[in-house]
Regions:
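C-terminal and late-domain segments of enzyme folds
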Residues: 1-36, 45, 49-56, 60-64, ...
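General beta-strand structural signal in soluble alpha/beta enzymes
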Residues: 13, 70-72, 96-97, 128-131, ...
């Protein structure tokens, strides 16, 4: 059964392709839900791929939506233990975890002061968005991008694994993730420009231009289009 521990904020897990036109309506809605105009962007997953450019792209994107971006200068574990940066996250109303390497992102965030602050902000009502690598990491189990098997994620959402870029992924990786899916877990394959949204009410929805493909060992595969609700409170496998 899908669980989100003590959730009181809004959670958006994106299948990739952040800050592009298909997400305009969703990102505008998330900004409004936050109750402010500031977005705290964490580029740590792109530490080896010009994280400064990630923040620049986000700044340009949210400016067009009436928002302003503050980049959180975190690229390694030492940064993630800084009290001043953790406080910025704890006080934020909208936190956006950018795409990149989920394994590097895990090494930065797992057990860190920064991750504790992010969770506290979310539990306090903040909007938390995570794209690609971030979406994968916030779940547990977590799809390992090196071969499609599973490893340990951060577990903000338990019992659910997210497979980003599902429609573009190599078939053998998708098939391996389905084959190795734990009996008590749900795999959500998210297409690019597609998001799994959990509202403060606890309801899950699929948003965006693509499809969410839902896999379980004990149920037929199903597809949910953007704009449709999604019941993730499925019974555990017997």
């Amino acid at each position: 059964m899908a669980t989100a521990k003590k959730p009181t904020g809004t959670l958006a897990l994106l299948g990739g392709g952040e800050w592009q036109d298909p997400y305009r309506e969703l990102d505008g809605a998330l900004l409004a839900m936050s109750g402010g105009d500031e977005v705290l962007v964490l580029p740590a997953a792109a530490a080896f791929e010009h994280p400064g450019r990630v923040v620049e792209r986000a700044t340009e994107w949210f400016a067009g939506l009436g928002g302003k971006v503050v980049g959180l200068d975190v690229v390694n574990r030492r940064d993630a233990e800084r009290d001043d940066l953790a406080k910025r996250a704890r006080d934020a109303r909208f936190i956006y975890i950018a795409d990149g390497s989920p394994l590097h992102l895990r090494s930065v965030l797992k057990g860190s002061a920064l991750y504790a602050a992010i969770v506290k902000a979310y539990h306090g009502g903040a909007v938390l968005a995570a794209s690609g690598a971030g979406a994968t990491l916030l779940c547990d189990p977590m799809v390992d991008p090196r071969g499609g098997a599973y490893t340990v994620g951060l577990g903000l959402v338990g019992g659910v694994a997210v497979f980003p870029y599902h429609g573009k992924a190599a078939a053998h990786l998708r098939e391996r993730s389905v084959e190795l899916l734990p009996a008590d877990a749900t795999l959500v394959g998210l297409d690019e420009h597609t998001a799994l949204l959990r509202l403060e009410s606890g309801e899950w929805h699929v948003e965006g231009s693509g499809t969410a493909t839902i896999y379980r060992k004990d149920a037929p595969t199903r597809e949910v289009e953007g704009g449709e609700p999604l019941d993730l409170a499925v019974p555990a496998a017997t």
